[in-house]
């Protein structure tokens, strides 16, 4: 129940939600929420309020759409706004393909299931859909300093900050092979 999510200053550790990072982020999120309020292709089923009189607070908002390519399904919002699209069970594989192709972004993603087959299928088919992929966990669950983190596609270079792989972004690795006894014949020894 979103009504139980306490929102306020990050100095108060009893708050679960705090303000978004800056006014630009607030304005972007508020504009998406306002758009949904007047759009026949989507509806707000929870939340939808915002206030910047003291801080940039966006109420956790859930949007329901019948259009799997609705703008809030394809855009990185970076705020407490999530859009839901309900698919038919018979379209599971088509829906996975749709998820993989819908957005140019690929920072994080998550699937929730108790069906081991569905988990494996989704994990395999969504291989390039998220730099960090979560199974039965929230997609914002990176453990800073303990878990490599980074997105692909338009979300970044998938460098995995916090891991040795990140070093590859800043260097130009190459392999050098030197032979101290140059070949005198093109044939491998086993060919003679």
Predicted regions and their residues:
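Conserved C-terminal structural/oligomerization subdomain of aldehyde/semialdehyde dehydrogenase
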Residues: 1-6, 50-53, 57-192
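Conserved small-domain helix->loop->beta segment predominantly found in fold-type I
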Residues: 9-18, 41-52, 66-69
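Intrinsically disordered, low-complexity coil segments
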Residues: 11, 38-41, 89-93
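Structural signature of PLP-dependent enzymes
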Residues: 17, 21-28
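Long, low-complexity segments enriched in small/aliphatic residues
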Residues: 27-43
């Amino acid at each position: 129940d979103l009504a139980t999510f306490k929102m306020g200053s990050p100095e108060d550790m009893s708050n679960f939600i705090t303000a978004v990072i800056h006014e630009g982020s607030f304005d972007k999120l508020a504009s998406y929420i306002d758009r949904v309020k007047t759009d026949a292709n989507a509806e707000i089923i929870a939340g939808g309020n915002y206030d910047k009189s003291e801080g940039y607070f966006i109420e956790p908002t859930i949007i329901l759409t019948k259009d799997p390519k609705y703008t809030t399904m394809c855009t990185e919002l970076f705020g407490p706004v999530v859009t839901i699209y309900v698919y038919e069970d018979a379209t599971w594989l088509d829906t996975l393909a749709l998820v993989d192709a819908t957005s140019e972004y690929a920072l994080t993603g998550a699937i929730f299931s108790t069906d081991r087959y569905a988990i494996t299928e989704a994990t395999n088919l969504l291989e390039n859909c998220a730099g960090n992929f979560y199974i039965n966990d929230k997609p914002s669950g990176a453990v800073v300093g303990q878990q490599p983190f980074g997105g692909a596609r338009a979300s970044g270079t998938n460098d995995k900050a916090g891991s040795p792989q990140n070093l590859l972004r800043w260097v130009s690795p190459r392999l050098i092979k030197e032979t101290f006894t140059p070949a005198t014949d093109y044939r491998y020894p086993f060919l003679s």
